[in-house]
Amino acid sequence: MKHYSIQPANLEFNAEGTPVSRDFDDVYFSNDNGLEETRYVFLGGNQLEVRFPEHPHPLFVVAESGFGTGLNFLTLWQAFDQFREAHPQARLQRLHFISFEKFPLTRADLALAHQHWPELAPWAEQLQAQWPMPLPGCHRLLLDEGRVTLDLWFGDINELTSQLDDSLNQKVDAWFLDGFAPAKNPDMWTQNLFNAMARLARPGGTLATFTSAGFVRRGLQEAGFTMQKRKGFGRKREMLCGVMEQTLPLPCSAPWFNRTGSSKREAAIIGGGIASALLSLALLRRGWQVTLYCADEAPALGASGNRQGALYPLLSKHDEALNRFFSNAFTFARRFYDQLPVKFDHDWCGVTQLGWDEKSQHKIAQMLSMDLPAELAVAVEANAVEQITGVATNCSGITYPQGGWLCPAELTRNVLELAQQQGLQIYYQYQLQNLSRKDDCWLLNFAGDQQATHSVVVLANGHQISRFSQTSTLPVYSVAGQVSHIPTTPELAELKQVLCYDGYLTPQNPANQHHCIGASYHRGSEDTAYSEDDQQQNRQRLIDCFPQAQWAKEVDVSDKEARCGVRCATRDHLPMVGNVPDYEATLVEYASLAEQKDEAVSAPVFDDLFMFAALGSRGLCSAPLCAEILAAQMSDEPIPMDASTLAALNPNRLWVRKLLKGKAVKAG
């Protein structure tokens, strides 16, 4: 998937105040009564008022072909709220709305369009507050405390539907086939789209559309829908409705990256850091019963225990998967943290990454050539760095205006407290020694002869993840590092943004008048003892990068305040999130994968055993989206990521890539 900045909608508002597309010469909604038309065509055409109370699942999934102003979504959300108020004991508790938009409105145009419908204001304001920046791919918005999920896919729907992960197949309960009229936008109304709609529709799923065009009806019938005409809204004579009355065979293009969930809703999580905390919250929101086992006497004593950590994306012109994942993970993280109902020290002050030498300058120049939205990243010249950061560096760079810093330790502790209020059970000082299958469950053996049995297990215990027989062959490694805590000075107190160079320096935390500077890097080490060498090196790297800056030379590390931790990392800098792969079975079953791709079956994994690991140094950026991805996978719900990027997070990816090329695979 090519990475590019999405072009915003080119529109104007007519005399009635209705938005009109200049490119397609068509209105976004009816000049007469767009709200009532939406209720009639899409809610009525899919019989949602009748289906909601009878729905046999806790989640109802709606997909839409053109988001536009969000009128259909807001109207549905309003109706869903009214349903929940009238039927609080119904099986259906959550709404998932998936929509595609090639030319998203700007936030300003969106707000202007929403003024048409004052009765939708309570819902429209929440949508506007989380409106994503124009990046391609999926933007997941968690609304109404997680009861409503909106997946906004920015890009061409005919391209995007071919790039969706198999987790979306046969998941859609109702389709809203909307968009500009077929005569105005023929490129959207294709057989390719109709086939994708059929593939994604659940057996018994429905569709509705405002048009009655013959080629649309015939195309949907060819795809597998049973179609019928219905009286149109207002002056329109007819519209179309359909139902998927059959179960279509599903294609599988890359079985080696298949993801399996679990029919069970009870899980144990092994860990105690940010990954465990955020995954607990995501599973609880989906109705899981969750137990957390932490080896330490308190949470966040491992890699998640730092006072300050920087939040900004990891970008690379030469690695599309890394680029796509981290840009969308970053924007999701900001939305997630902003709406999280817990307190934690943070400041979205911005992050500036500086080119202190020729190599770093070249890397930044490559990042800036990717046509990124200004909301995500902008170039900053050397003479402007002092103005935006508060300190002189004599370097140019790239600024992430929505980045900043937060306290990982406080975040982790308070998220776990919130999760406990929602039913999470936590056991501290439970060191997992081994785990094994027993009667379709997992038997967990802890130090001190403690045992527990759980239906599903998630390993989220950082660098200790490879200590079990099921995970000992994973290609992950430990990285020990030391962060120095330095007292502020009059010059350092002027620092307004996080600085990244051959290290990083945070603005002072008002809670303690200290900065964090770091971090040392010792690959393969798990040593957490204080190191005076590391303390001095943290200071020296700052001086070496900014040799003309007097403020850098005045950094004082003499009080020996520091924190040492160990991270878990991978060679490709991407997390490992998904099923725990079975190494031995993979080598056997995929021995001839390079020659027999067409005969491949799903990759071997351990049943009901999952992992959430290798967050490296960017866990604050990646953990929220990874938690959402894994919780969705475990619950057999739509995953907010395209197939190729999701494959790059699969724990078996490094083995499979070699096997596909006919190369030998080694453990670790």
UniProtKB/Swiss-Prot annotation:
It is found in: Cytoplasm. Its EC number is 2.1.1.61, 1.5.-.-. One of its GO terms (biological process) is tRNA wobble uridine modification. Keywords: Cytoplasm, FAD, Flavoprotein, Methyltransferase, Multifunctional enzyme, Oxidoreductase, S-adenosyl-L-methionine, Transferase, tRNA processing. Pfam families: DAO (PF01266), Methyltransf_30 (PF05430). Residues 1-245 are annotated as: tRNA (mnm(5)s(2)U34)-methyltransferase. In the N-terminal section; belongs to the methyltransferase superfamily. tRNA (mnm(5)s(2)U34)-methyltransferase family. In the C-terminal section; belongs to the DAO family. This is tRNA 5-methylaminomethyl-2-thiouridine biosynthesis bifunctional protein MnmC.
